[in-house]
C-alpha cells in the first residue's frame, strides 16, 4: 500500500545549496534501505553518522527491498541519485519530446548501475464530453486570477526557486495565446500554483489518446488531480478511469509481503 516520493527541498527556515540537499537525500535513501533490509543501521556519511542503530520496528513485511521509491528532479545530482537508488522517475508535464529526453538522461544514469527505471507523470486533468467544454472550463478556472496574486502564491512555495519550477514557467512562456504548449496540454493552471503547472484539457477521447501516447513512451505511473478536487475526481473517475489499463508497480516489482501482515488492515474484518 505504501510508496514513497523523495523530495530534495529545503526544510522550513533553511536555505541549503542544491548539492547539499541532494547529498542529504542520497544518504537518507541509503539509510532507509538499511532500515528496511538489515537488523542494524551502520552508516558513515558526510552528513549522517549512525552506528549500531536497531531497525526494529521499522523493517517492513517486504523481504526484498522495502517500499518503491519515487523521485523527481532535473539537475545532474538529481539524475545521479535517481539512477542509483530509486525506482520511478517522476516528471512534471512538458512537451512529449522534452519528456522523452528527460527519460533518456536518467536512463543513462541508471545504466551505470545496471538498473532499469520506471517512469511517472504528475499532471492535472480537465476532461469533459467535448474539447470546447473542457477549454471553456479551463478558461473559467483562471478567469478571475490576478497575475500578481498568482505570482505571490507561487513565490510562497518552498520550491519556488527550483530548476523544475523554472522549467514549468518556461512552458508558459512557450505556450500559445490560449496557454497551450502542445495540443491538449494547458499551462494556465501554473499561473496560480508552484510545482506541477500544466493540465491535460480535452474530450474523453483526446485525454485517453494523450495518456496512451505517454504509455507508449514507457510511462506507466501517473498522478492525476484537478480543481476543485472532489468534482474533478468524480468526473475523471466516471469518464476516464474505467477505460485505463492499470498496473500495480509493487506487484510488478515483487515488492509485496510474502505473507499477510498481522495488522488490523491485514487481517481485520472488512465491513
Q: What role is predicted for each listed range?
A:
Residues 2-6, 69-72, 87-91, 117-124, ...:
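Hydrophobic faces of well-ordered beta-strands that scaffold small-molecule active sites
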Residues 7-11, 74-76, 94, 122-128, ...:
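Active-site beta-loop-alpha junctions enriched in small/polar residues
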Residues 10-12, 93-96, 224-237:
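Glycine-rich, proline-tolerant flexible connector loops at the mouths of alpha/beta enzymes
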Residues 18-62, 94-216, 245-271:
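An alpha-helical appendage that flanks or caps ligand/catalytic pockets
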Residues 79-83, 212:
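Alpha-helical segments flanking ligand/cofactor-binding loops in enzyme cores
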Residues 84-85, 217:
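Structural motif
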Residues 205-208, 217, 221-222, 227, ...:
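Long, low-complexity C-terminal extensions of enzymes
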Amino acid at each position: 500500500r505504501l510508496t514513497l516520493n523523495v523530495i530534495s527541498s529545503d526544510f522550513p527556515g533553511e536555505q541549503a545549496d542544491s548539492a547539499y540537499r541532494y547529498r542529504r537525500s542520497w544518504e537518507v535513501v541509503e539509510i532507509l534501505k538499511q532500515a528496511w533490509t538489515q537488523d542494524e543501521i551502520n552508516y558513515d556519511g558526510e552528513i549522517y553518522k549512525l552506528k549500531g542503530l536497531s531497525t526494529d520496528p521499522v523493517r517492513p513485511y517486504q523481504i526484498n527491498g522495502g517500499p518503491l521509491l519515487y523521485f523527481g528532479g532535473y539537475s545532474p545530482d538529481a539524475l545521479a541519485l535517481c539512477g542509483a537508488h530509486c525506482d520511478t522517475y517522476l516528471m512534471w508535464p512538458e512537451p512529449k519530446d522534452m519528456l522523452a529526453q528527460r527519460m533518456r538522461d536518467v536512463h543513462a544514469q541508471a545504466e551505470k548501475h545496471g538498473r532499469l527505471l520506471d517512469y511517472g507523470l504528475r499532471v492535472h486533468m480537465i476532461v469533459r464530453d467535448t474539447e470546447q467544454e473542457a477549454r471553456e472550463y479551463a478558461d473559467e478556472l483562471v478567469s478571475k486570477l490576478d497575475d500578481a496574486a498568482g505570482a505571490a502564491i507561487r513565490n510562497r512555495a518552498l520550491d519556488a526557486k527550483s530548476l523544475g519550477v523554472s522549467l514549468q514557467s518556461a512552458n508558459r512562456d512557450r505556450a500559445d495565446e490560449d496557454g497551450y504548449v502542445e495540443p491538449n496540454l494547458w499551462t494556465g493552471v501554473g499561473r496560480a500554483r508552484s510545482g506541477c503547472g500544466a493540465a491535460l484539457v480535452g474530450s474523453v477521447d483526446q485525454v485517453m489518446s494523450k495518456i496512451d501516447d505517454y504509455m507508449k513512451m514507457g510511462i506507466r505511473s501517473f498522478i492525476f488531480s484537478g480543481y476543485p478536487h472532489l468534482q474533478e475526481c468524480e468526473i475523471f473517475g466516471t469518464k476516464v478511469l474505467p477505460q485505463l489499463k492499470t498496473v500495480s508497480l509493487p506487484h510488478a516489482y515483487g515488492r509485496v509481503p510474502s505473507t499477510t501482515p498481522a495488522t488490523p488492515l491485514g487481517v481485520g474484518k472488512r465491513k
